Amino acid sequence: MAQWNQLQQLDTRYLEQLHQLYSDSFPMELRQFLAPWIESQDWAYAASKESHATLVFHNLLGEIDQQYSRFLQESNVLYQHNLRRIKQFLQSRYLEKPMEIARIVARCLWEESRLLQTAATAAQQGGQANHPTAAVVTEKQQMLEQHLQDVRKRVQDLEQKMKVVENLQDDFDFNYKTLKSQGDMQDLNGNNQSVTRQKMQQLEQMLTALDQMRRSIVSELAGLLSAMEYVQKTLTDEELADWKRRQQIACIGGPPNICLDRLENWITSLAESQLQTRQQIKKLEELQQKVSYKGDPIVQHRPMLEERIVELFRNLMKSAFVVERQPCMPMHPDRPLVIKTGVQFTTKVRLLVKFPELNYQLKIKVCIDKDSGDVAALRGSRKFNILGTNTKVMNMEESNNGSLSAEFKHLTLREQRCGNGGRANCDASLIVTEELHLITFETEVYHQGLKIDLETHSLPVVVISNICQMPNAWASILWYNMLTNNPKNVNFFTKPPIGTWDQVAEVLSWQFSSTTKRGLSIEQLTTLAEKLLGPGVNYSGCQITWAKFCKENMAGKGFSFWVWLDNIIDLVKKYILALWNEGYIMGFISKERERAILSTKPPGTFLLRFSESSKEGGVTFTWVEKDISGKTQIQSVEPYTKQQLNNMSFAEIIMGYKIMDATNILVSPLVYLYPDIPKEEAFGKYCRPESQEHPEADPGSAAPYLKTKFICVTPTTCSNTIDLPMSPRTLDSLMQFGNNGEGAEPSAGGQFESLTFDMELTSECATSPM
């Protein structure tokens, strides 16, 4: 079954997570219309190869045209309009950046597969009593459901008792007025009043019963309000707080378990019960106005009950107003909460009380740093204005599940310029990527005679003015959301708390697993721990400061740990994503460990790892070989950076890499990817077929062109070889080989970085006849 069809059969909670994946950057409608074709493409490869991305993008536009023709034949005007709009949007945004749409689609498809896997795992664990985590969560939710059901039942029982009391009071009122009228007549006629006294006794008995019923109802109302208070505290202080924490985790790459539908159903159910109870309390006031007496419990307790139910409902409504989707720039969906001035960002708010009567009634206003006292307390903090459509009315039509929400799609920030270049005080206490700002959403609710002011705010955001500030800004977002669940601590970085390696390791792994199909292994994390903390046996519980993580240079390096790692993450996403997803890149491994695992392998075995010395992010390969004396040697090529990988894919570099041996013959030192995968099996599918690489020769030309192929060659000196006699033919060949590369800019990749001895080596990227 196609992946998209499987997704349609999931429960509502999973479908809500599916909705979170899609936005204007890649509309869900397009995913629906072209599901089979989209799933048949290799988007991961397209995301790492611009030429292939361009081809796939143009094929995508062609598929849209074909689907449009089908809708045209079906006279489906709405779908025609939507598809035309989608195509125009894709052309305007991705025509010059086809790799961007490829990355977005690849990420969505991978998240879909993760969602299916999560649903399947949950289904398998549903009936297993030996899964403690699943059992605790299920039991907790069942208890909450039972409490809500109990509240609803008690409200309905009270409704019936209110009717009984009302009927009893009507009977008492009628008999009392009748007796009073008869008593007046008897007084006028002077008749015996024995009958009247008998009826008075009956009225007293009715009043006693009425008083008992009233006291019972007042007592039950007080107990019901206490039960509501308990359920509300569980919902807001536990369930909603847990959701907000999960949202924080999801923002920094953690599991996207942030569905709100179930929580919305619970809160809506409680709100409905509270409003019904408030009407019952109002009914008590009506009964009191008709019949009242000395010691009336309604007179004594109704005002307090009214005050309690109104306070509960107000607090529930205030808690139910949440930011469903945190501020995020569409071009950087994997890095929310970082906003660049002048660049549009989106956000979405939602009211978890699903009352149809509130549809199109709540006007939301957006502002930034409303409570500017905390922000202003930081010397030199910048100030911003929100531009664009900063007001919107909440409605149920825009959301896929009918929730009451408002999505802001066209917001931008502009810095308020001051005389010293925009900063309020040049003596700033924090750098700009450590400044935290809050985006606030406000509205007013008028419902059943109540006016309630609602306000919620985003998680703290970092505002940058240049995209080069993104790495440090994202580090701030990671550190904040990793270490605190305080949603408003804009002073966090005046004294940033210390994290533990266990916390940092989990977040670092998320940076890979959230944008690729693979997180970090224990061995890879251990290597990173060694870079941060130095050699050690057990890093669990070791403390890491904010400065060590992001600001201080690593030992012997001119850059920080985070700058180095972030550039590697960028390198993986843009250039070697497919190879990383396959698990072919060992990545983070110490040179000692590298030597240990390769030294026992046959010559030609190689592994792929990230450079430890390249600030911009580099990837290299290390292989084992035998020198002429039979001694095992471990060799590494100088790391390939983004600049080289822009011109040739890493898979093609590996497949074509050559060295010139002692006999001046080009040979490939790379045979088996560690541990024993043939090179062709691992990387062949990621190289273009020769038929695509070399177009047909012009049939009208005098002679066909000779086909050429770019390969990376490392010519060696004789420092580690015995001088061999060289024939004139070999010398001529080498001279010609050197002249072919004359004038060309030498590639940074292709040079040895010897792990055993120093070698004087050069690098050339040459063309050789096919």
Swiss-Prot record:
Changing residue 506 to K: In ADMIO1; uncertain significance. It comes from the Eukaryota. Changing residue 330 to S: In ADMIO1; increases transcriptional activity; increases binding to ISL1 promoter region; decreases glucose stimulated insulin secretion. The keyword Metal-binding does not apply. One of its GO terms (molecular function) is protein kinase binding. The keyword Cytoplasm applies. Changing residue 422 to R: In ADMIO1; uncertain significance. Changing residue 302 to Q: In ADMIO1; uncertain significance. Changing residue 389 to I: In HIES1; likely pathogenic; loss of transcriptional activity. SUPFAM superfamilies: p53-like transcription factors, SH2 domain, STAT, Transcription factor STAT-4 N-domain. The modification Phosphotyrosine is found at residues 640, 705. Changing residue 162 to R: In ADMIO1; uncertain significance. Changing residue 361 to R: In ADMIO1; uncertain significance. Changing residue 278 to H: In ADMIO1; likely pathogenic; results in increased transcriptional activation. Heart, brain, placenta, lung, liver, skeletal muscle, kidney and pancreas. Expressed in naive CD4(+) T cells as well as T-helper Th17, Th1 and Th2 cells. Changing residue 640 to F: In ADMIO1; likely pathogenic; gain-of-function variant resulting in increased transcriptional activation following IFN and LIF stimulation; increased phosphorylation at Y-705 and translocation to the nucleus. Changing residue 415 to Q: In ADMIO1; likely pathogenic. A motif (Essential for nuclear import) lies at residues 150-162. The modification N6-acetyllysine is found at residues 49, 87, 601, 615, 631, 685, 707. The modification Allysine is found at residues 601, 615, 631, 685. Changing residue 103 to W: In ADMIO1; uncertain significance. Forms a homodimer or a heterodimer with a related family member (at least STAT1). Component of a promoter-binding complex composed of STAT3, NFATC3 and NFATC4; complex formation is enhanced by calcineurin. Interacts with IL31RA, NCOA1, PELP1, SIPAR, SOCS7, STATIP1 and TMF1. Interacts with IL23R in presence of IL23. Interacts (via SH2 domain) with NLK. Interacts with ARL2BP; the interaction is enhanced by LIF and JAK1 expression. Interacts with KPNA4 and KPNA5; KPNA4 may be the primary mediator of nuclear import. This is Signal transducer and activator of transcription 3. It comes from Homo sapiens.
